[in-house]
Amino acid sequence: MQLKALEVREITDYIKKMMDNDIILRNVRVKGEISNLKYHSTGIYFTLKDEIASLKCVMFNEYGKLLNFTLQDGMSVIVTGRISVYERNGTYQLYAQSIQSDGIGALYFAFNKLKEKLQKEGLFDSDKKKPIPKHPKKIAVVTSPTGAVIRDIITISRRRNPTVDILVVPVLVQGSSAADEICNAFRILNKREDIDVIILARGGGSLEEIWPFNEEKVARCIYASRIPVVSAVGHETDFTISDFVADLRAPTPSAAAEIVVPDIKVYQRELFLLKTKLLTLMTAELNRKKKEFEGLKRALYLNSPTKKSEILRHKVENLTASLYNEMLSIYQHKRNDFLILAEKLNSLSPLKVLTRGYTIVLDKQEKVISSVRDIKPYDEIKILFKDGKAKAIVQEVKENE
């Protein structure tokens, strides 16, 4: 009996039904290493392999969106799903419904691979880090809206500086949708003009739980942000890709608030010191200007007509006084000379002998008669005494023998 010839689609359909109805193949867990990874609009396509065999796999978007980490070539994973036939090319493949990392090692592998890639691109370069503003007015906190993280940040911020405005941007911080929500928050914030700094925060957790902060898309959103970003993910010992890309890494969310929010007491102290310094500078400048003003005032006064007139008046007064003193000195000197000469003249005067009892005889012409030969009898003469004069007539003239 000759076998009936089946068409390709018939045998393929038969094999597919056998696989779909197989109780084992309908729900399998397969462990292997990812290779030939490709992201497509319809889902994620990759090959799962070990040392001997390989298995094509596909994870459609309805399941792919539930992934809480990014797949990487070389990553060891455990894929859960069903084995079926892809009729178009007649190959069987694993239709994945969930993917788990095969231990922490797989996630560390993906972490280090992405870290190396981004580092080569320069996303971690220190010279590209933006400075964190010293006195921010408004801080955006991208984190879960509930839990200890946001409470601690708000409490510390209000304690340090109640004037700083805190804007909470709620996002998922774990799970497959977390990375997209974080990136969307960054896009929204970067359209605003009132945000001074962004804090990206979440509490501690396992590597799987904090994996969204190791996603490449999150790293690139942080790097592209024009607003400075502080990464505060997990505990002090936790490091994420976000920490390396951010402008500043804080060891904890609470530490981020301590770093970003300025202490108002320090600000008040700085303000007091600045006020004191300003007052000192103003006082010094005022004194300098006052001295300058006094100098200009004096110069103006010295060059004014009134001052010049006053100076000339003082000069005239000084010259007058000097001339008076000089004339007085000359007068005194001449008077003394006159008195001395008068005394000398007086001592030599013929009239001086009258005080000693002598007399002076004058003729009619008031000439002194010094000899009897100058007179004759009956001449009229005048006799001068110290206290008066007398007239007489000569009775007799006789010469000495």
UniProtKB/Swiss-Prot annotation:
Main subcellular location: cytoplasm
Catalytic reactions of this protein: Exonucleolytic cleavage in either 5'- to 3'- or 3'- to 5'-direction to yield nucleoside 5'-phosphates
InterPro entries documented for this protein: Exonuc_VII_L, Exonuc_VII_lsu_C, NA-bd_OB-fold, OB-fold_nuc-bd_dom
GO annotations of cellular component type: cytoplasm; exodeoxyribonuclease VII complex
One function term, GO molecular function aspect: nucleic acid binding
Keyword match Mitochondrion: no
Keywords: Cytoplasm, Exonuclease, Hydrolase, Nuclease
Coiled coil: none
A biological-process GO annotation: DNA catabolic process
EC numbers, comma separated: 3.1.11.6
Localization terms from the record: Cytoplasm
Record bears the keyword Nuclease: yes
Subunit structure: Heterooligomer composed of large and small subunits.
Function: Bidirectionally degrades single-stranded DNA into large acid-insoluble oligonucleotides, which are then degraded further into small acid-soluble oligonucleotides.
Family as reported in the entry's similarity comment: Belongs to the XseA family.
The name this protein goes by in its record: Exodeoxyribonuclease 7 large subunit
Organism from which the protein derives: Thermoanaerobacter sp. (strain X514)
Organism phylogeny: Bacteria, Bacillati, Bacillota, Clostridia, Thermoanaerobacterales
